[in-house]
């Protein structure tokens, strides 16, 4: 807002700048929609809560990708059931994939055994009474595959319900809860503040729920909503973003769409590669794709596809290419773009072995490091001395307790 005030001038104190999660958090706390002592937990703390129920080492789970992914599925499933209970439209479900085909088959088998109809209410009822259905996996004549499906589902339901109950009893919210609770409140309360002017950046990154919240925030009479997005970036479906989001907005904003057609940075030969991919793989209209005003011609080996037989050889070949480019012109810089932080770490190690100086931009967000989380926890308790999660982080951070689970139990006993 300081930058906006310098450019535009005037009073900008009423201007809200932030992502959808930030707006939801600000709304819930400042409008007293949740208890004053509520606290927001991150993924690490959510895993710690479930690990405590499962009597597993929370740090061991965090270090093991497959186990961590299983915990995430439990968390996602809890949100799935919440949305089912609150009758959210299917297109707004955050994690429909958490209710797998195997889960559906398991539910159908339980319903068949119990002689009840298979529907949403059956799913919700079994979820809330999962332990009462464990014997369904031992029904005589039931094949082993279906029995395993039932066991996996019921344990997932049980721990998801435990996670939900723990959050409710301790006034905790995870990041998805911020969206879900804000959506529910705005959907039913006409007195909530609506906004006449809204600007949404990186709209291709929004999932259906986030877009629905923005719609609920908008006044009905003559609103001005500006969406800024990039169709070529709408490929990150693992984040919940989809090309369909932009397609929906294009239909909604028909006649009021402006395309930025000129790319001033990339040479034409490189931009053509990305445009061809966008047209043929993402099915984006060629007329909507940018053109370059940099018509420099490609030199030999400017565009190359290098085949590697193994991951290790790929890392070595990438390192060799980067080193050759550096030796050809030490004034130029080379960027190596990878798909994950672990890939960056491995390539960095390979470059270190051959003495190739480089700067690695990857790793965990600074604000998720233990030291920064500990610092922010101190500030949090100054603002709200009843913030139990902040106290838990402090007690774990100063090594008063070896785990978040023990620190949480101690805080609970102090209440």
Where are the regions that the model predicts?
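Conserved helicase NTPase motor core
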Residues: 16, 42-46, 141, 145-248, ...
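Extended, charge-rich low-complexity interaction segments
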Residues: 47-58, 290-300, 388-413
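Helicase P-loop NTPase motor core
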Residues: 254-256, 262-357, 383-384
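Conserved P-loop NTPase-based nucleic-acid remodeling module centered on helicase motor cores
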Residues: 2-103, 247
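ATPase/helicase motor core of nucleic-acid motors
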Residues: 22, 252, 327-415
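Conserved ATP-driven helicase/translocase motor core recognized via long
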Residues: 58-62, 76-153, 158
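Short glycine-/polar-rich loops that comprise or flank the Walker A/P-loop
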Residues: 11-14, 220-224, 230-232, 252-257, ...
């Amino acid at each position: 807002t300081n930058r906006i005030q310098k450019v535009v001038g005037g009073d900008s104190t009423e201007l809200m700048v932030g992502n959808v999660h930030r707006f939801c958090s600000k709304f819930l706390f400042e409008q007293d929609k949740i208890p004053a002592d509520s606290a927001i937990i991150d993924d690490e703390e959510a895993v710690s809560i479930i690990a405590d129920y499962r009597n597993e080492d929370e740090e061991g789970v965090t270090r093991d990708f497959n186990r961590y992914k299983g915990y995430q599925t439990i968390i996602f499933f809890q949100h799935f059931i919440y949305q089912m209970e609150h009758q959210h439209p299917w297109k707004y479900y955050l994690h429909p994939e958490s209710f797998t085909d195997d889960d559906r088959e398991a539910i159908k088998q339980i319903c068949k055994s119990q002689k009840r109809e298979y529907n949403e209410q059956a799913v919700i009822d079994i979820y809330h009474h999962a332990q009462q259905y464990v014997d369904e996996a031992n029904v005589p004549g039931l094949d082993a595959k279906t029995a395993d499906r039932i066991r996996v589902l019921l344990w997932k339901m049980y721990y998801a319900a435990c996670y939900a109950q723990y959050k409710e009893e301790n006034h905790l919210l995870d990041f998805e809860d911020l969206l879900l609770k804000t959506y529910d409140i705005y959907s039913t309360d006409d007195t909530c503040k609506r906004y006449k002017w809204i600007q949404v950046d990186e709209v291709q990154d929004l999932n259906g729920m986030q877009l629905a919240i923005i719609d609920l925030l908008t006044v009905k009479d003559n609103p001005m909503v500006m969406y800024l997005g990039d169709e070529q970036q709408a490929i990150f479906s693992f984040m919940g973003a989809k090309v369909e989001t932009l397609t929906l907005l294009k239909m909604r904003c028909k006649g009021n769409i402006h395309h930025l057609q000129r790319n001033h940075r990339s040479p034409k030969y490189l931009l053509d590669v990305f445009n061809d991919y966008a047209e043929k793989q993402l099915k984006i209209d060629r007329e909507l794709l940018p053109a370059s005003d940099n018509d420099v011609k490609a030199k030999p080996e400017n565009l190359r596809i290098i085949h590697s037989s193994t991951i290790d050889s790929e890392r070595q070949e990438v390192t060799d290419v980067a080193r050759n480019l550096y030796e050809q012109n030490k004034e130029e810089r080379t960027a190596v773009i990878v798909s994950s932080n672990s890939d960056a770490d491995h390539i960095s190690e390979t470059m270190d072995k051959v003495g190739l100086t480089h700067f690695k931009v990857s790793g965990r967000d600074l604000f998720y490091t233990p030291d920064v989380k500990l610092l922010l926890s101190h500030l949090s308790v100054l603002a709200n001395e009843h913030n139990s999660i902040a106290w838990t982080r402090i007690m774990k951070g100063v090594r008063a307790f070896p785990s978040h689970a023990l620190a949480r139990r101690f805080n609970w006993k102090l209440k």
